[in-house]
Amino acid sequence: MTSLTIALALALAATPAAKQKAPNKAGKADACVACHQGTSPNIVADWKASRHATLGVGCTDCHGADHTTKDDAERAKLPNPDTCAQCHEAQVAGFKRGKHAFAWAAVKAMPTFHYQALAVREGLKGCGGCHKLGLKSEAEAKELKETAGGYGVASCDACHTRHLFSKAEARQPEACKTCHMGFDHPQWEMYDSSKHGVRNDLKRTKTIPETSAAPTCQTCHMQEGNHEVRTAWGFLAVRLPFPEGDKQWTDDRVTILQGLGVLDPAGKPTGRLEVVKAADVARLTQEAFDKERAKTLDTCTKCHGAGFAKEQLKQGDGLIRDLDHLMAEGIRVVAGLYQDGTLAKPANYASPFPDLLTFHDAPTPVEQKLFVMFLEHRMRAFQGAFHANPDYVTWYGWSEMQRDLTEIRAAADELRRAKKVDAQLEAAAKSKK
């Protein structure tokens, strides 16, 4: 044996092994496979093609050994992140620290979530279908088992689809597509039509070399396999502290936070701020923002010059400032309707501001328009700016917000005019009596 071989052997022996549960022998899955080959053959096919099968990780490693016949299927355990952590400790630990882990808490915190149809909530046919990847308490998991047929307690399979559980699949941008698309978060559409997405497509078709830079969602949001998946501006592009030396932006951000119910009419924190903290939906310190911004900048500079990358991020921040001014003006117009009695403030609203988190449950057309302005058009402009998609910024975001504000102002004028006419007619009717 050469000295080099000996050195390599010693080095490998000294390397700490990744924590991994001793896998089930593949033969132990034979009984499960024999039955499920007939009842659910594609599940078996996926498992057989998986890395799990190659390593001898069998059905009972994840589902337990209590289910043995067709009459006791309810005894099969449904895996949760702790099941995966038996072998994938670092990845699950990163997930638990990150944004996706708070997805269930975030959707449950919405003030009108309980108004929605059961199938939309716990039935996983609407909001719950994506937000179910978040961690649940024992009580929440029990509730899901009672209302959703026992499903929805898993998390990792949102990206590593069962029963293949492929790392290669989860590394592709399409893995993000199911949840990050559509009305309020069309990141897929933005990415796919951006230069980043286009180059990824061209790389796949071998139109450009295999060595070409072609960032995917994971390149920018899961650097080196980081499962925390955080961004500096968070999901809604709101954060603390307020900008120093910029009174206009500070005033606008205060108004938006009042519309979100995070600040009261005096600008003081409400109980919702604690909910925001618990759900980790926003960066609430400069240090937290700077940490995520530094990670983003480091990623950008792998393909771009540092000066260009910094300027693009700066331009994105500046756009949010301008979007916030339009949004705050819209909120102030609707709040003014409450204040002068033109609109009755809903009894369940804690302050004389429209509650942006009621979303489509907003009670009047003008408040519905404000909801669309916030959750569709502001989101598209903000997200488009950071997904290299100028068309989304302009025509699906900025332009629509300008139109929203014009229509909100016109609606407010019409509501006040109608109220004045009604008062005059009522006074005239009384004078005739």
Roles of regions detected by a PLM:
Residues 62-65:
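Intrinsically disordered linkers and flanking regulatory tails adjacent to Zn-binding modules
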Residues 21, 42-54, 68-124, 133-425, ...:
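Primarily the internal scaffold of c-type cytochrome electron-transfer domains
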Residues 17-37, 428:
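Short N-terminal segments immediately surrounding and downstream of signal-peptide cleavage
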Residues 37, 129-132:
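Small Cys/His zinc-coordinating "RING-like" fingers
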Residues 4-16:
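Hydrophobic h-region of N-terminal signal peptides that target proteins for export
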